[in-house]
């Protein structure tokens, strides 16, 4: 879950208080590299989605209770995210500021929803700030799904902090991490009338954030080549890693994404300016949007192409498209020679979009050089391509995953079969053996 370059210099104050100097010193001297893996801490409500490529990454989702009793030290931060990559902080918590002040705003601003990486509705907090150490209308958070596969990690959670509004609103957040690739964060607001929705992304003070166009923001370390100034000397963490934040094109969110500044509190009573990306829209509910976070290294930054359909015009930068149909919501991410499709069922019935049809709750595909290179199906019993069976599970499955580059083929439960069409689309001759290994057989002829 941590970078192999973990050192005492990068430890937070909280870790030192929790484990003590002796434990910190032992960790700094450790010769074995910590394992990078996703892990859940359900009792505390923390879910860590981790990856090791192209460098160590860990996103922490806060899905726990706001606090004990009236949540004196709690913040209104349900479903907020924090992200570390390549040994440094990227998406951060705003801190606490001060506890006691003549102006209540000094205390309430940094413990409010707007100071965290989550959704705010109608400009109000998820809970109602009372005294400096108490809240009312404290939300309840539910974790609806958690899967840590070999080539992906998936989290779904929701909270009812806005149920107190005249038109009650529920915020549901999906986080899907593709190993070695993109993060897709899907935010849904369930309600019946028009509301102002806002998602804020707070970045560490030592990062440079540039709006490249209305739908894409580039985040880089200060002094890196990506920021346009001379690169710093030292490790990749000091100059090569970067992040692209992409919102869907041709949506109200695309034109309402802005880069500004805010204040963080790295220690009690201390404040520091830091970059903030604010995405907002006034929309009729139910409504949703997605944010793609694409890690990169400056030295291997890639150009892009188009997505689900083959033979499409090349593009120079990553683009995220959003398409909604009656039964499925689709997000398409295009970059380099890769096309990434994210399909989310909107109900219990089967759906179809383009060449794909399935009863899976979530489907992900990566097409590279006109070949299927990665496939994930969460829930459901089948996946089909152009009306022909591709994959079949014996019953509703937790998930199925296949990835070409490292021979991953995995499912829970393990009773599934792939057809000859699967080999045709993937060029993977291992599919027949995979069927035999799982006491299954192909069930359709090659078309």
Task: Give, region by region, the residue ranges found by the protein language model.
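Extended, loop-rich substrate-binding clefts of extracytoplasmic carbohydrate-active enzymes
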Residues: 35-58, 125-178
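Active-site rim segments in enzyme catalytic domains, especially the processed small/beta chain
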Residues: 72, 76-142, 148
């Amino acid at each position: 879950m941590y970078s192999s370059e973990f050192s005492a210099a990068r430890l937070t104050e909280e870790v030192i208080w929790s484990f003590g100097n002796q434990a910190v010193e032992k960790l700094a001297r450790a010769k074995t590299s910590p394992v990078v893996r996703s892990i859940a801490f359900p009792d505390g409500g923390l879910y860590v989605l981790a990856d090791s490529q192209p460098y160590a990454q860990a996103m922490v989702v806060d899905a726990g209770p706001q606090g004990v009793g009236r949540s004196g030290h709690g913040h209104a931060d349900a479903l907020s995210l924090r992200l570390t990559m390549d040994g440094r902080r990227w998406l951060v918590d705003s801190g606490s500021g001060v506890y006691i002040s003549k102006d209540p705003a000094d205390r309430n601003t940094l413990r409010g929803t707007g100071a965290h990486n989550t959704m705010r509705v109608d400009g109000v907090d998820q809970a109602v700030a009372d005294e400096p150490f108490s809240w009312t209308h404290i939300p309840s958070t539910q974790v609806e799904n958690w899967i840590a596969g070999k080539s992906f990690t998936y989290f779904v959670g929701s909270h009812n902090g806005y149920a107190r509004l005249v038109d009650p609103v529920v915020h549901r957040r999906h986080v899907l991490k593709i190993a070695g690739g993109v993060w897709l964060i899907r935010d849904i607001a369930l309600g019946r009338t028009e509301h102002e929705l806002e998602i804020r992304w707070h970045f560490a003070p030592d990062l440079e954030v540039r709006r490249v166009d209305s739908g894409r923001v580039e985040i880089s370390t200060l002094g890196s080549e990506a920021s346009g100034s001379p690169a710093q000397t030292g490790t990749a963490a000091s100059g090569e890693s970067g992040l692209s934040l992409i919102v869907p094109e041709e949506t109200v969110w695309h034109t309402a994404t802005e880069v500004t500044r805010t204040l963080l509190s790295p220690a009690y009573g201390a404040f520091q300016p830091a970059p903030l990306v604010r995405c907002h829209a006034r929309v009729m509910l139910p409504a949703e949007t997605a944010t793609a976070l694409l890690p990169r290294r400056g030295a291997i930054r890639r150009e892009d192409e188009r997505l689900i359909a083959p033979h499409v015009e090349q593009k120079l930068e990553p683009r995220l498209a959003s398409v909604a149909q009656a039964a499925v919501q689709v997000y398409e991410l295009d970059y380099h020679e890769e096309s990434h499709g994210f399909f989310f069922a909107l109900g219990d019935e089967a759906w179809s979009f383009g060449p794909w049809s399935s009863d899976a709750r979530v489907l992900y595909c990566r097409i590279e050089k006109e070949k299927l290179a990665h496939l994930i199906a969460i829930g459901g019993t089948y996946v089909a391509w152009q009306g022909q069976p591709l994959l079949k599970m014996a019953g509703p499955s937790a998930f199925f995953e296949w990835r070409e580059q490292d021979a991953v083929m995995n499912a829970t439960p393990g009773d599934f079969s792939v057809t000859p069409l699967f080999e045709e689309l993937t060029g993977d001759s291992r599919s027949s053996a995979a069927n035999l290994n799982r006491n299954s057989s192909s069930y359709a002829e090659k078309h």
